[in-house]
């Protein structure tokens, strides 16, 4: 396989991952983006639900209590985390949500179709792709009442460095991981990854030409730092 073919495959993989996860973000006064994270919508034969981190929910609740006009969106669709909460776990740092029909129609992404849930845990010889929407890739037009907010997915392909029954760790060394695609301006070493929390981690299954959702980012700090992918429940 030549370099061009490999890059095209990576670009297609990145686009697929981007279609399966969305930024969850909230603003105040229709002017300021206050904070946000990443959410994956999962579709099983029994239910449709969204997953992000418990700490993302807690930050939203804190800001909602402090600012009466906080308005939340999942992608481009309206979303109220508090009203749609199914359950949460501080231990696993995960929260699950109902996704209203209006949000599903308008959030601009697809749900991940899970044939079985939960999946088999990640192992050290697995090849995985994971990503999310860091604040450093967020763009808001200048001036009051900006009409749009755009944000870019940051994603990586690599193997885990450590696995346990409860969590998986990755070391995001820019010299060792593969960016999807090989972007012209990758994040610099030390760049904040805040906003990637809740992003999905997929196992690559080339023999079946598919990816399998196997976890969620629970702690994203900086490039060249460790973070963990939580066990799905």
Regions inferred by a protein language model and the residue ranges of each:
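Extended Gly/Ser/Thr-rich low-complexity repeat segments
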Residues: 64-70, 106-114, 192-193
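A conserved mid-domain beta-alpha-beta active-site/ligand-binding segment of alpha/beta enzyme cores
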Residues: 166-189
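Glycine-centered structural positions embedded in regular secondary structure
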Residues: 39, 132-134, 151-166, 170, ...
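Catalytic histidine site
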Residues: 5-87, 95-102, 156, 160, ...
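Long hydrophobic alpha-helical segments typical of transmembrane helices together
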Residues: 207-233
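Conserved active-site neighborhood of the chymotrypsin/trypsin-like protease fold
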Residues: 47-52, 56-60, 88-124, 136-142
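Catalytic nucleophile loop of clan PA
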Residues: 184-217
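Short glycine/Trp-rich loop-beta-loop segment that forms part of the substrate-binding cleft
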Residues: 114-162
């Amino acid at each position: 396989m030549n370099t061009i073919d490999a890059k095209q495959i990576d670009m297609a993989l990145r686009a697929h991952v981007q279609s399966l996860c969305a930024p969850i973000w909230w603003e105040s006064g229709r002017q300021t983006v206050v904070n946000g994270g990443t959410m994956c919508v999962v579709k099983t034969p029994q239910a449709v639900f969204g997953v992000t981190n418990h700490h993302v929910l807690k930050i939203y609740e804190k800001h909602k209590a402090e600012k009466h006009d906080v308005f939340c969106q999942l992608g481009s669709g309206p979303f109220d985390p508090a009203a749609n909460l199914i359950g949460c776990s501080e231990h696993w740092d995960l929260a699950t949500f109902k996704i209203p029909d209006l949000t599903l129609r308008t959030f601009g992404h697809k749900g991940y179709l899970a044939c079985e849930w939960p999946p088999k845990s990640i192992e050290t010889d697995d090849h995985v792709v994971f990503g999310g929407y860091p604040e450093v890739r967020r763009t808001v037009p200048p001036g009051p009442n900006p009409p749009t907010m755009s944000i870019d997915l940051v994603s990586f392909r690599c193997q885990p460095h450590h696995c346990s029954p409860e969590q998986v760790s990755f070391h995001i060394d820019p010299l060792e991981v593969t960016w999807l695609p090989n972007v012209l301006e990758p994040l610099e070493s030390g760049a904040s990854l805040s906003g990637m929390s809740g992003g999905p981690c997929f196992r690559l299954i080339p023999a079946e030409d598919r990816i399998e959702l196997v976890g969620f980012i629970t702690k994203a700090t900086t490039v060249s730092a460790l973070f963990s992918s939580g066990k799905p429940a």
